[in-house]
């Protein structure tokens, strides 16, 4: 059975760069929300000798993640998941989108793929320093003084 590596946020950036480091004996599935970006990335990988496929997936939607899991398992045994999908304020992400994609999306990907992955398989969640450098619109600074009062 073929070994499958799923990379979320694979249409560009860290996801696509990570795909280029994977062994060429794996089937690579790049996911993201924009098929045109995924198709360009897939063409780039195929030129490098990879067997690669594109699948749109919104990681903030559990049903979309379940569809991705079904697609991935139809191609072989999922051995690796690189979860690099994410947004930041610099990408014009709203607080709601940041929470849905970066937090809930991570949980959905981990939970759904863990159901089908065997021992020895690996899920890697890629993050950024955004967890440590929160944008001002997320931090309720005006509420801090209220916390010191009765």
Predicted regions: what they are:
Residues 98-99:
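A hydrophobic alpha-helix adjacent to the NAD(P)-binding/active-site core of NAD(P)-dependent oxidoreductases
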Residues 60-75:
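Conserved Rossmann-fold cofactor-binding substructure of NAD(P)-dependent oxidoreductases
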Residues 87-92, 122-150:
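Catalytic loop of short-chain dehydrogenase/reductase
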Residues 47-63:
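Rossmann-fold cofactor-recognition segment
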Residues 9-12:
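Conserved glycine-rich cofactor-binding loop
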């Amino acid at each position: 059975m073929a070994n499958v590596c799923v990379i979320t946020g694979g249409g560009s950036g860290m996801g696509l760069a990570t795909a280029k480091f994977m062994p060429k004996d794996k089937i690579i599935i790049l996911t993201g929300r924009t098929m045109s970006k995924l198709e360009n990335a897939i063409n780039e990988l195929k030129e490098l000798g990879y067997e690669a496929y594109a699948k749109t997936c919104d990681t903030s939607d559990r049903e979309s993640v379940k569809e991705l899991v079904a697609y991935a398992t139809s191609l072989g045994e999922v051995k690796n998941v690189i979860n690099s999908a994410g947004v930041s304020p610099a990408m014009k992400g709203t607080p709601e989108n940041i929470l849905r994609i970066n937090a809930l999306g991570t949980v959905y990907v981990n939970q759904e793929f863990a159901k089908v992955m065997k021992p020895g398989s690996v899920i890697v969640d890629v993050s950024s320093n955004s967890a440590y450098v929160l944008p001002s619109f997320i931090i309720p600074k005006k509420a801090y003084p209220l916390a010191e009062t009765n």
